[in-house]
């Protein structure tokens, strides 16, 4: 025996329509905007009047509007339910006039509160005052765990700087293992709760990295930092591969970029006592190289292969041979093609695969741009040396790098990459101004007035550029000039950085 089918009817509202000396009862849907059926209603009303021998509606259907019986206009963009129209109400069809639309008024507080609650909860929840749910409780618990992890990290690093005991590393590692177990339980039991898995995973990665850095004996130095950074990189990649979320991929890429740069600096410091300024110069040059390589790295991470050249018959025209580079192809002759390979095959990627690859490429580019922008202010801070013999050259290197970062933003079509680069460059400018202000003698003019004027002028220039550039269509000569200025800045940057870092002096001696 089959269960009876359930039929759902839309909410309706029976009202009286008054026009001139005529009155007609009609039933309208109460849950959709009046605009959807208003003109049809006027046409049907006109046809009904003419069928009964009366004069029809004088004006076209779009020249009328609905009023309440007290003369207040109704907004046809809302439904009858939202307007507070109930069964038996009388509405007046009148020519359209200028004025404000009607907002429903309630004679009692309870009726108004009930109507407001119904409107707020029509999409399944209160959109103004969100209640405490299980998701809220879970996120609050993760925040509490993060606070506890922060306390453990601070105490672990403090204790490790005092003593060479393995207890701090064991304590941080033990708590990190517990968080790893929690992440695995969430992964196996609640696979859809990626938020909890990410929370447990990132906290575990931080704790395990600190434990690995504190485990080797000796005073904390570059070697310990290198070990911890490598653990962070491996843990971040693991989380990114497990979650496969777009925003998670961007975060993982940013973390890997920052930690990779810091790990390279730590590796150099392990073997050579390189000065901070030389390391900062190398980092600035490396950041520019990373920005230029961002599209290539993103395509490599997304495994987007070089284009495939084929004919409309399905036979390959070009193919890669054994021993050839991955980005090169060679012509295919008839003797190389087998008969069974001559079938018509569609080798074009499907739209879903192309969209997934595009999202992954975009996420990787966003992460790399954000990571590079986070490192740029620190690198500029390390390059600048106020009141030193080569201070002007350091200022030139930092200024050229910041300018190249700003111009590189126009090479990205998505907004997040460009915004990240521009914000990183602006933060670098503020960091440079702050370093010069802190290094000058304590005084109102040099320590506050001139830095504040410079920062205000830079902000005003940024505002002017933001207002003019997006709304202006520049001529090709202007765009070509900007490109040539960018090339000249790159040409001037490399010798200046080499001279500032002592490369020419090292080669001469």
UniProtKB/Swiss-Prot annotation:
Domain of life: Bacteria
Family matches, as InterPro entries: EccD_transm (IPR044049), T7SS_EccD (IPR006707), YukD-like (IPR024962)
Disulphide bond pairs: none
Bilayer topology term: Multi-pass membrane protein
Subunit structure and binding partners: Part of the ESX-2 / type VII secretion system (T7SS), which is composed of cytosolic and membrane components.
GO cellular component, as recorded: plasma membrane
Keywords from the named record: Cell membrane, Membrane, Transmembrane, Transmembrane helix
Designated name of the protein: ESX-2 secretion system protein eccD2
Location of this chain's protein in the cell: Cell membrane
Family stated for the protein in its record: Belongs to the EccD/Snm4 family.
Segments passing through the bilayer: 135-155, 170-190, 196-216, 222-242, 248-268, 281-301, 364-384, 389-409, 418-438, 449-469, 487-507
């Amino acid at each position: 025996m089959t269960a009876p089918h359930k039929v759902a009817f839309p909410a309706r509202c029976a009202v009286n329509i008054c026009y001139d000396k005529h009155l007609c009862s009609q039933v309208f849907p109460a849950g959709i905007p009046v605009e959807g059926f208003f003109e049809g209603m006027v046409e049907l009303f006109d046809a009904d009047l003419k069928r009964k021998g009366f004069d029809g509606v004088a004006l076209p259907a779009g020249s009328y509007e609905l009023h309440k019986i007290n003369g207040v206009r109704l907004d046809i963009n809302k439904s009858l339910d939202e307007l507070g129209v109930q069964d038996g109400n009388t509405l007046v069809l009148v020519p359209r006039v200028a004025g404000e639309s009607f907002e429903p008024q309630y004679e009692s507080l309870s009726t108004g509160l009930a109507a407001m609650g119904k409107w707020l909860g029509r999409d399944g929840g209160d959109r103004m005052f969100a209640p405490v749910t299980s998701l809220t409780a879970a996120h609050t618990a993760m925040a509490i765990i993060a606070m506890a992890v922060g306390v453990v990290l601070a105490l672990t690093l403090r204790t490790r700087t005092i003593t060479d005991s393995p207890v701090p590393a064991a304590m941080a590692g033990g708590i990190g293992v517990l968080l790893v177990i929690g992440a695995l339980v969430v992964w196996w039991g609640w696979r859809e709760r990626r938020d909890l898995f990410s929370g447990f995973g990132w906290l575990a990665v931080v704790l395990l990295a600190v434990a690995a850095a504190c485990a080797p004996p000796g005073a904390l130095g570059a070697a310990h930092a290198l070990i911890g950074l490598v653990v962070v990189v491996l843990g971040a990649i693991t989380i990114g591969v497990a979650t496969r979320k777009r925003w998670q991929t961007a975060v993982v890429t940013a973390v890997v970029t920052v930690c990779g740069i810091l790990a390279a600096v730590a590796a150099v410091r392990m073997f050579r006592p390189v000065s901070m300024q030389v390391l900062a110069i190398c980092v600035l040059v490396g950041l520019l190289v990373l920005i230029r390589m961002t599209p290539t790295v993103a395509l490599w991470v997304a495994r987007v292969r070089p284009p495939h050249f084929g004919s409309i018959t399905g036979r390959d025209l070009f193919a890669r041979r054994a021993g050839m580079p991955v980005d090169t192809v060679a012509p295919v002759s008839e003797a190389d093609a087998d008969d069974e390979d001559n079938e018509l095959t569609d080798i074009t990627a499907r739209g879903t695969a192309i969209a997934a690859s595009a999202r992954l490429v975009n996420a990787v580019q966003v992460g790399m741009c954000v990571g590079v922008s986070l490192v740029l202010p620190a690198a500029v801070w390390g390059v600048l040396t106020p009141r030193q013999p080569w201070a002007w050259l350091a200022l030139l290197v930092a200024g050229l790098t910041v300018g190249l970062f700003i111009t590189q933003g126009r090479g990205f079509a998505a907004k997040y990459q460009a915004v990240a680069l521009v914000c990183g460059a602006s933060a670098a400018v503020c960091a440079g101004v702050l370093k010069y202000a802190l290094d000058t003698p304590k005084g109102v003019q040099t320590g506050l007035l001139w830095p504040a004027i410079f920062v205000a002028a830079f902000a005003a220039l940024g505002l002017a550029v933001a207002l003019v550039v997006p709304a202006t269509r520049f001529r090709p000569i202007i765009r070509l000039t900007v490109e040539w200025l960018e090339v000249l800045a790159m040409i001037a940057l490399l010798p200046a950085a080499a001279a500032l870092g002592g490369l020419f002096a090292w080669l001469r001696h």
